[in-house]
Curated annotation (Swiss-Prot):
It holds the Pfam family ABC_tran. InterPro entries: AAA+_ATPase, ABC_carbohydrate_import_ATPase, ABC_transporter-like_ATP-bd, P-loop_NTPase. The lineage of its organism: Bacteria, Pseudomonadati, Pseudomonadota, Gammaproteobacteria, Enterobacterales. The keyword Cell membrane applies. The keyword Flavoprotein does not apply. This is Autoinducer 2 import ATP-binding protein LsrA. It comes from the Bacteria. It is found in: Cell inner membrane. Residues 12-240, 264-503 form the ABC transporter domain. GO terms for molecular function: ATP binding; ATP hydrolysis activity.
């Protein structure tokens, strides 16, 4: 039986943690504490040091100095195996599953014999409301389900310290509520949770304490109930931010190439009764100079539709018209040359070559247009142009994409798509897992792109994002678009959610 003194000990106490990369101080004497049964939310801007701190706690990266006190014992450094033995589990922002193994094999992989319990796994699946076929390949899951599998892996390991990095980034509101219910059950058993997120309403809903990191330090820390939203946002982004791109940024962002210019409102991409894997009888028109929102719950068929438009999946019926010409039989490369560009939702597995240089990644879609040999100087100049336009933070063009923060990786992916001179740009979850500051940058960027008469199809599970950004909105429900486009005052979160859940009655906007 534990004494009161033992119970009072924090699960985790990081003291004076320092870390440096290539002479740059990433962490500057961080102190961070997590108690039993507590959710401690960790926020911060792009490159604030959140991921580095969590990697040190999880044993992935060693600290230069400082100590970790876990269960009353001090450690100068940990390995991943040792961290697991101490009950620490990091659920990454980008799920790291074995795609060729089954869901069951992924959940049980690496477990000690005493933790191998099929009944326990089935109970957890039922508690989370997961309808998985355990024998299906993990590679067949969408991002939201892969996130759930990662969380299950941590819970199956009897983790006492659970680190969740943007766990709800790809979850629907219903899935988020289900996850939070399960987390509350874990908290009741004494588990402590570090919750990394940029969604302030969710943080206020679940977190007991909040710490904000900025420039490698803790800029703000306290009880959630005692911190105002203004305090938190000011701590994350102290500098005054512009509401639109500066004139200099707009100059650098002028799209390259001899891209055909369409008049505003000209149909660029038209879908006529499309049917494919995960959707059926979808019709819509995307016009030049507009941002068309495509909303819906996870599993509604939006990503499947986008991948079919780009030629990554087989079209079973209907016609795709780009600039008035049918492109059904064209390859992905041919569609790209015609001006159809796709930004996928999973930047790490589908969007970027993480081991290639930043300059190579930005120019990856246009290399074949420049001849057989890569032109390093030209690639570097292209990267520099987008660095100025998008505020991308990096040290040198040759560094690998995997060395950047998630927000900067997303900006590199956007730059890659823009360099292909799009006429129609499909962006799937463009702000998933990026910080408040970078999210604002991306919003400004999308508006600037549309202002150059590019037709933008915005796919997002964030209904507030759709409301903020879209000129018109279509909502998919179970693979179909059952309503005409929402416009004007009908573009609001409540109406979008009603349609997404299959409500046939559209609620009128209030006066």
């Amino acid at each position: 039986m534990q004494t009161s003194d033992t119970r009072a000990l924090p699960l985790l106490c990081a003291r004076s943690v320092y870390k440096q990369y290539s002479g740059v101080n990433v962490l500057k004497g961080i102190d961070f504490t997590l108690h039993q049964g507590e959710v401690h939310a960790l926020l911060g801007g792009n490159g604030a040091g959140k991921s580095t701190l969590m990697k040190i706690i999880a044993g992935i990266t060693p600290a230069d100095s400082g100590t970790l006190e876990i269960g009353g014992n001090n450690y100068a450094r940990l390995t991943p195996v040792h961290a697991h033995q101490l009950g620490i589990y990091l659920v990454p922002q980008e799920p790291l599953l074995f795609p060729s193994l089954s869901i069951k094999e992924n959940i049980l992989f690496g477990l000690a014999k005493k933790q191998l319990s099929m009944q326990k796994m089935k109970n957890l699946l039922a508690a989370l409301g997961c309808q998985f076929d355990l024998h299906s390949l993990a590679g067949s899951l969408d991002v939201a389900d892969r996130q759930m599998v990662e969380i299950l892996r941590g819970v199956m390991r009897d983790s006492r310290i659970l680190i969740l990095d943007e766990p709800t980034a790809s979850l629907t509101p219903a899935e988020t509520e289900r996850l939070f219910s399960r987390l509350q059950e874990l908290l009741a058993t004494g588990v402590g949770i570090v919750f990394i997120s940029h969604k302030l309403p969710e943080i206020r809903q679940i977190a007991d304490r909040i710490s904000v990191m900025r420039d490698g330090t803790i800029a703000l820390s306290g009880k959630t109930s005692e911190l105002s939203t203004d305090d938190i946002i000011q701590a994350i982004t102290p500098a005054v931010r512009e509401k639109s791109l500066s004139a200099s940024q707009k100059l650098w962002l002028e799209l390259p190439g001899n891209r055909p210019q369409h008049a505003v409102g000209t149909p660029v991409l038209t879908l006529e009764n499309l049917t494919g894997e995960g959707f059926r009888n979808v019709s819509l028109t995307l016009n030049a100079g507009e941002i068309l929102g495509l909303a819906g719950l996870v599993g509604a068929g939006r990503t499947e539709l986008a991948e079919t438009l780009y030629g990554l999946r087989t079209l079973r019926g209907g016609r795709i018209m780009l600039n008035g010409k049918e492109i059904n039989k064209l390859s992905t490369g041919e569609r790209l040359l015609r001006g159809l560009v796709y930004l996928p939702e999973d930047r790490q597995s589908s969007g970027l070559n993480l081991d290639a240089s930043l300059a190579w990644n930005v120019c990856a879609l246009t290399h074949n247009l420049r001849g057989f040999w890569a032109k390093t100087a030209k690639d570097n100049a292209t990267l520099e142009r987008y660095r100025r336009a998008l505020n991308i933070k990096f040290n040198q063009p040759e560094q690998a994409a995997r060395t950047l923060s998630g927000s900067n990786q997303q900006k590199i992916l956007i730059a890659k798509c823009l360099e292909a001179s799009p006429q129609a740009l499909i962006v799937d979850e463009p702000t998933r897992g990026v910080d408040v500051s970078a999210r604002n940058d991306i919003y400004q960027l999308l508006r600037s792109i549309a202002a150059q008469n590019v037709a933008v199809l915005l796919i997002s599970s964030d209904m507030e994002e759709i409301e903020l950004m879209a000129d018109r909105v279509y909502v998919m429900h179970q693979g179909e678009i059952t309503h005409s486009a929402l416009t004007g005052r009908d573009i609001n979160v409540e109406t979008i959610m009603r349609v997404a859940f299959g409500d046939s009655q559209r609620q009128e906007a209030s006066c």
